[in-house]
Amino acid sequence: MQEKKEEDLQQALNKVSEVGIDEVGKGAIFGPVFAAAVVLTEKNKFILKQFGVTDSKKLTPKKRKLLLPKILLLSSDYGIGQSSAREIDKLGIRVATELSMIRALRKLKEKPSELIIDGPLLLRPWNGIQKNIVSGDSKFISIASASIVAKVSRDNLMERLEKNYSGYLIFKNKGYGTREHLSLIKKNGITELHRKSFLKKSKLI
């Protein structure tokens, strides 16, 4: 009888899934905004928590890269989406971020009926239950996992782009508007991957 209960519990843990979604790069001035959606069973959420999965901002780059393959291996499914700097300038960062999330969700094999999203952003259009969680990447392993997948994916792109945009130290600032990055823009000019709508606010255009 006890073995049957344990077997039933194990099956339940393997079946129950949670879909977390998060974005990264929303505040950068260069390059796309990224989003990731990660599907996890209860069992694998527990395992990833033991590995140290938490909000990507609380982890070192090395730790994030070590956790990424574990997340991808233990996830039932995952998707990554992005919106370009041009789309951000055209649509605004809010709509472009929504679009990156929708694109990540469309990469999933099955459309989820329920999502948990980090922060207050409501996806439109999206038919299904959405739960918006403030600081969700610190509270839900699925959102934390999504934040790591999105962060490492975007950082990897920034490092690759450094070859063509070496005058902006993209590998170092990851596209964010550091004082050094802004100084290099004044010196070298604006590229097609800089978000012009953001730079206007900094009076660099």
Swiss-Prot record:
Cofactor info, note text: Manganese or magnesium. Binds 1 divalent metal ion per monomer in the absence of substrate. May bind a second metal ion after substrate binding.
Keyword set, alphabetical order: Cytoplasm, Endonuclease, Hydrolase, Manganese, Metal-binding, Nuclease
A Gene Ontology biological process term: mismatch repair
Cited SUPFAM superfamilies: Ribonuclease H-like (SSF53098)
Broad class of the protein's primary localization: cytoplasm
RNase H type-2 domain sequence ranges: 16-205
A GO term for molecular function: manganese ion binding
Annotated binding of a divalent metal cation, by residue: D22, E23, D118
Catalytic activity: Endonucleolytic cleavage to 5'-phosphomonoester
Cofactor(s) needed by this chain: Mn(2+); Mg(2+)
Gene Ontology cellular-component annotations: cytoplasm; ribonuclease H2 complex
Entry EC number(s): 3.1.26.4
Subcellular localization: Cytoplasm
CDD domains listed in its UniProt record: RNase_HII_bacteria_HII_like (cd07182)
Top-rank lineage group of the source organism: Bacteria
Similarity section: Belongs to the RNase HII family.
PANTHER family xref list: RIBONUCLEASE H2 SUBUNIT A (PTHR10954), RIBONUCLEASE HII (PTHR10954:SF18)
NCBIfam families: PRK00015.1-3, PRK13925.1
HAMAP family reported for this sequence: RNase_HII_B
Biological function: Endonuclease that specifically degrades the RNA of RNA-DNA hybrids.
Full protein name: Ribonuclease HII
Organism: Prochlorococcus marinus (strain AS9601)
